[in-house]
From Swiss-Prot:
Pfam family, one: GTP_EFTU
Xref: InterPro entries: EF-G-like_DII (IPR053905), EFG_II (IPR041095), EFG_III (IPR009022), EFG_III/V (IPR035647), EFG_IV (IPR047872), EFG_V (IPR035649), EFG_V-like (IPR000640), G_TR_CS (IPR031157)
CDD domains linked to this entry: EF-G, EFG_III, EFG_mtEFG1_IV, EFG_mtEFG_C, EFG_mtEFG_II
Binding positions for GTP per the UniProt entry: 17-24, 81-85, 135-138
Domain tr-type G: 8-282
Protein name per the record: Elongation factor G
Species this chain originates from: Staphylococcus epidermidis (strain ATCC 35984 / DSM 28319 / BCRC 17069 / CCUG 31568 / BM 3577 / RP62A)
Entry's Gene Ontology cellular component terms: cytoplasm
GO biological process: ribosome disassembly
Function: Catalyzes the GTP-dependent ribosomal translocation step during translation elongation. During this step, the ribosome changes from the pre-translocational (PRE) to the post-translocational (POST) state as the newly formed A-site-bound peptidyl-tRNA and P-site-bound deacylated tRNA move to the P and E sites, respectively. Catalyzes the coordinated movement of the two tRNA molecules, the mRNA and conformational changes in the ribosome.
Cellular location(s): Cytoplasm
UniProt entry keywords in alphabetical sequence: Cytoplasm, Elongation factor, GTP-binding, Nucleotide-binding, Protein biosynthesis
Example of a GO MF term: translation elongation factor activity
Residue ranges that the Swiss-Prot or TrEMBL entry lists as coiled coil: none
Length: 693
């Protein structure tokens, strides 16, 4: 069966924004206008097509990135709706990895908000071209010019409008297209009837000025256009479109559009811009992987149906009807249902049962998926997020994704014996779906500990266990993931010698420990000369240190950011063994704890609080009382924004405190930023608590 849409006519896009900027509603409208749904669902009524999990409908936020496919003007548009809440950054991260372009949705009243900055940074990391849709132009306080200025001020983005709104709030009635110099007026509530009219006289001058600014911004990286512009030559619509497309695809320019998805204005024009300015799989740089057996040999996955099959699995989900669904993006070649593929990341052979094209939560079975497309497979048992799938002869591994470690932990226990097994299965499935969610059993207490990226993240996962897996569990108080590190260098000896009749045990090491830079992790250096410690025991020394570091030296927390140099030692021909050197290394670490000034580190969160100005004093006082450090303040519209770094341990229950301090008018976002040393008095309390004193 031949493909329905050529690669040139395919777009893989994400819709990303701050929570509540109207992202899901925008996606809904796209589906409505492209004929994918026949009735529009509202997020605040819990009826949205894209928010298909129960928790999403209850909370009115998007958690999982639902992938859906739509058609517009002879093009296939695959859309991934990504969550805007900071606890779900991993969802954004993994969808950006497989997209060719994105639509950033802004709230016309607030402009760029904290989470917009986070996802914008992630998109820049992955080199994703973007167009910006200033949504909610009908909202009280909507200000298009202000929103555009926040793109420059907060993101330093080379952005310029390619549209201008006529009116705002209740008066928002038409949109000027600056590329074609036309005006579009909406005449019915559903936004399906649009009149093309001349630009009204009183808006002509403003439109011409804005067009000149647009050409200037695009021409910065386009010599031909710059020449014409400086020579006052006429620039045709096609020339300008080509230049905008080129600059957008090169991630050097961001076109800005406007509208209101809720009131059905501007969405079709935004869809036109997706087709006109965002790249097809052919326009982006081909993805480069490496050979599975030789990491230094680069392999290019070309977007070509006749090439060897290569795809990246970017999401795993459990569907109540079909079981495990693996979403993947095909970079080269084709895949048919019923065929075998190789998971080159794990070196496993897998059989693809069925192939599905998803539409939020309904699905259509397909026989073949082609390069540049996004689909879901049923039947892949071993494949997880970030794994490469390829043809059995192909041996490519595409660059995988890196996921942050959890910063918050809770203990969970099943309410009844019957829930025990179900809970174990639920935790295994949830970990498969979400790489930032960890679960393990504490060896000392026997408790099951779950870890994630924030309170809301874990809340929702516990909620899912109850609703999807029927597991009732009791949840303990949140626990912070502390770490330990050394502040001073020292040289120490670790010697293990045991004689108890028969063969003894002997291992002796001299190790120099030095602090590593923040985030540098553990580095081991072998500086042994002349074989005083035989080569076969060196890995045991490193492993012994790693194992001992897991349990720290002060309060049982992992020791991080330390360098260890093995420079001397001794061995015994008969009595030395791998185990003896492992124990010697752990004894050296114990010795280092006495000399290297160990300290406890705590996770520091970057917190952004927005509230009316009159509450500023209370909020600042509260941040200081929580051991926070204010990093700056700025006015935003008629509100004030405070940026601060606050220890995670002080942020539990902050939502309630902020509500009472601002009478419900304040909002905040926070995400993990770095680890910092805990004050001595608090460190002593932590150590006492962990030793059970």
């Amino acid at each position: 069966m031949a493909r329905d849409f050529s690669l040139k006519n395919t777009r893989n896009i994400g819709i990303m924004a701050h929570i509540d900027a109207g992202k899901t509603t925008t996606t809904e409208r796209i589906l409505y206008y492209t004929g994918r749904i026949h009735k529009i669902g509202e997020t605040h009524e819990g009826a949205s097509q894209m928010d298909w999990m129960e928790q999403e409908q209850d909370r009115g936020i998007t958690i999982t990135s639902a992938a859906t496919t739509a058609q517009w003007q002879g093009h296939r548009v695959n859309i991934i709706d990504t969550p805007g809440h900071v606890d779900f950054t991993v969802e954004v991260e993994r969808s950006l990895r497989v997209l060719d372009g994105a639509v950033t949705v802004l709230d016309a009243q607030s402009g760029v908000e904290p989470q917009t900055e986070t996802v914008w940074r992630q998109a820049t990391t992955y080199g994703v071209p973007r167009i910006v849709f200033v949504n909610k132009m009908d909202k009280l306080g909507a200000n298009f010019e202000y929103s555009v200025s926040t793109l420059h001020d907060r993101l330093q983005a080379n952005a310029a409008p390619i549209q201008l709104p006529i009116g705002a709030e209740d008066e928002f009635e038409a949109i000027i297209d600056l590329v074609e110099m036309k005006c579009f007026k909406y005449t019915n509530d559903l936004g399906t009837e649009i009149d093309e009219i001349e630009i009204p006289e009183d808006h002509k001058e403003r439109a011409e000025e804005a067009r000149a600014q647009l050409i200037e911004a695009v021409a910065e990286n386009n010599d031909d256009l710059m020449e014409k512009y400086l020579g006052d030559e006429e620039i045709s619509v096609d020339e300008l479109k080509d230049a905008i497309r080129q600059a957008t695809t090169d991630v050097e320019f961001y076109p800005v559009l406007c509208g209101t998805a809720f009131k059905n204005k501007g969405v079709q024009l935004m869809l036109n811009a997706v087709i006109d300015y965002l790249p097809s799989p052919l326009d982006v740089k081909p993805i480069i992987g490496h050979r599975a057996n030789n990491p230094d040999e680069e392999v290019v996955a070309k977007p070509d149906d006749s090439a060897e099959f290569a795809a990246l699995a970017f999401k795993v989900m459990t569907d109540p009807y079909v079981g495990k669904l693996t979403f993947f993006r095909v970079y080269s070649g084709t895949l048919s249902s019923g065929s075998y593929v190789k998971n080159s990341s794990k070196d496993k052979r897998e059989r693809v049962g069925r192939l599905l094209q998803m539409h939020a939560n309904s699905r259509q079975e397909i026989d073949t998926v082609y390069s540049g497309e996004i689909a879901a497979a049923v039947g892949l048992k071993e494949t997880g997020t970030g794994d490469t799938l390829c043809g059995e002869k192909n041996d490519i591994i595409l660059e995988s994704m890196e996921f942050p470690e959890p910063v918050i932990h809770l203990s969970v226990e099943p309410k009844s014996k019957a829930d025990q097994d179900k809970m174990t299965q639920a935790l295994v499935k949830l970990q498969e779906e979400d790489p930032t969610f960890h679960a393990h059993t504490d060896e000392e207490t026997g408790q099951v500990i779950i870890g994630g990226m924030g309170e809301l993240h874990l809340d929702i996962l516990v909620d899912r266990m109850k609703k999807e897996f029927n597991v009732e569990c009791n949840v303990g108080a949140p626990m912070v993931s502390y770490r330990e590190t050394f502040k001073q260098p020292a040289q120490v000896q670790g010697k293990f010698s045991r004689q108890s009749g028969g063969r003894g045990q002997y291992g002796d090491v001299h190790i120099e420990f030095t602090p590593n830079e923040t985030g540098g992790g553990f580095e081991f250096e072998n500086a042994i000369v002349g074989g005083v410690v035989p080569r076969e025991y060196i890995p045991s020394v490193e492993q012994g240190l790693k194992d001992a570091m897991e349990n720290g030296v002060l309060a049982g927390y992992p020791l991080i950011d330390v360098k260890a140099k093995l420079f001397d030692g001794s061995y015994h021909d008969v009595d030395s063994s791998e185990m003896a050197f492992k124990i010697a290394a752990s004894l050296a670490l114990k010795e280092a704890a006495k000399k290297c000034d160990p300290v406890i580190l705590e996770p520091m969160m970057k917190v952004t609080i927005e509230m009316p100005e009159e509450y500023m004093g209370d909020i600042m006082g509260d941040v200081t009382a929580r051991r926070g450090r204010v990093d700056g303040m700025e006015p935003r519209g008629n509100a004030q924004v405070v940026n601060a770094y606050v220890p995670l341990s002080e942020m539990f229950g902050y939502a309630t405190s902020l509500r009472s301090n601002t009478q419900g008018r304040g909002t905040y976002t926070m995400y993990f930023d770095h680890y910092a040393e805990v004050p001595k008095s608090i460190a002593e309390e932590i150590i006492k608590k962990n030793k059970g004193e």
